[in-house]
């Protein structure tokens, strides 16, 4: 399980040094094989260990290519999916097209989200956190049933 937000740097080649605390887990779970794709709703990237991505691919394969909305999701997620292999120094090369999509610069946030990571431009991440907190504090909407059961 991946959790927490960590500031990491992209080098001049677009490589991301995976924090040490995740490396052993990623080598054990996926031999360092990862898949990176776009997020459909946020200006960030999604980074999955290969076995987790394969579950997503199975779900996507069950969608109908005859349904325009389902085909669009397939096209966006699969069309942007890029395999990346962690090197011996624990670095992942993030494809240039993906870096451009999320406007990633040198400093990026690696955000653990259970079975995957999100990759955010640092400033965009901090703005998103602020916006999310503001939205939670100002919302008048009742919590969904599942959120009501979440006891923090």
Swiss-Prot record:
Pfam families membership: MraZ (PF02381)
InterPro entries (alphabetical): MraZ, MraZ_C, MraZ_dom, MraZ_N, MraZ_sf, SpoVT-AbrB_dom, SpoVT-AbrB_sf
GO-annotated biological processes: negative regulation of DNA-templated transcription initiation
Disulfide bridge map: none
Subunit structure and binding partners: Forms oligomers.
NCBIfam families: division/cell wall cluster transcriptional repressor MraZ (TIGR00242)
Record-given protein name: Transcriptional regulator MraZ
Protein's organism: Pectobacterium atrosepticum (strain SCRI 1043 / ATCC BAA-672) (Erwinia carotovora subsp. atroseptica)
């Amino acid at each position: 399980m991946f959790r927490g937000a960590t500031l990491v740097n992209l080098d001049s080649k677009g490589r991301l040094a995976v924090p040490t605390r995740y490396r052993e887990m990623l080598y054990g779970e996926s031999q360092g094989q990862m898949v990176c794709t776009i997020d459909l709703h946020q200006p960030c990237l999604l980074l999955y260990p290969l076995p987790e991505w394969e579950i997503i691919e199975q779900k996507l394969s069950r969608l109908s290519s005859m349904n325009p909305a389902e085909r669009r999701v397939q096209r966006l997620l699969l069309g942007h999916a890029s395999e990346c292999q962690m090197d011996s120094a624990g670095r992942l090369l993030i494809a240039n097209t993906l870096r451009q999509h999320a406007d990633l610069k040198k400093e990026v946030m690696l955000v653990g989200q259970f079975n995957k990571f999100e990759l955010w431009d640092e400033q965009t991440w901090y703005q998103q956190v602020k916006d999310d907190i503001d939205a939670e504090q100002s919302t008048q909407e009742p919590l969904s049933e599942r959120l009501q059961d979440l006891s923090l």
